[in-house]
Amino acid sequence: MKYDTSELCDIYQEDVNVVEPLFTNFGGRTSFGGQITTVKCFEDNGLLYDLLQENGHGRVLLVDGGGSVRRALIDAELGNLAVQNEWEGIVVYGAVRQVDDLEELDLGIQAMAATPAGAASEGIGESDTRVNFGGVTFFSGDHLYADNTGVILSKDALDLE
């Protein structure tokens, strides 16, 4: 499904929060949305590997990487795993790498920047925890919609029909 965050903001202005414009699209899918699963991890993507093995149909992985752009939390291997398990998209408050490969995937990926350095994979972090960045507080179960214009958040799914 294609999402237009500008239109959604016009229709649901009282129901959505607009995330500050921190992100660039790195995935092959320019718009995406779904129910979020939150993760907090700093320069370590081991927990992301575990979560992306789950069925991601209708889901978006929201990663609070502490805003670090020193180490990439998402790479081509994790992107392919997300596609294999039908995730709608990934939003990273941090960095990605192997961007030429990521843009070929049928997956929405928004992140702050790209860097060639990879993250550790020790599995350090927390999932399904409250995270806050971009002027918005995110909870697992909230609904996120993203396109090239921006990222918005709603407590409930928006009626898009």
UniProtKB/Swiss-Prot annotation:
Globally modulates RNA abundance by binding to RNase E (Rne) and regulating its endonucleolytic activity. Can modulate Rne action in a substrate-dependent manner by altering the composition of the degradosome. Modulates RNA-binding and helicase activities of the degradosome. It holds the Pfam family RraA-like. Homotrimer. Binds to both RNA-binding sites in the C-terminal region of Rne and to RhlB. Belongs to the RraA family. GO terms for molecular function: endoribonuclease inhibitor activity; enzyme binding. This is Regulator of ribonuclease activity A. Keywords: Cytoplasm. It is found in: Cytoplasm. It comes from Sodalis glossinidius (strain morsitans). GO terms for biological process: negative regulation of RNA catabolic process.
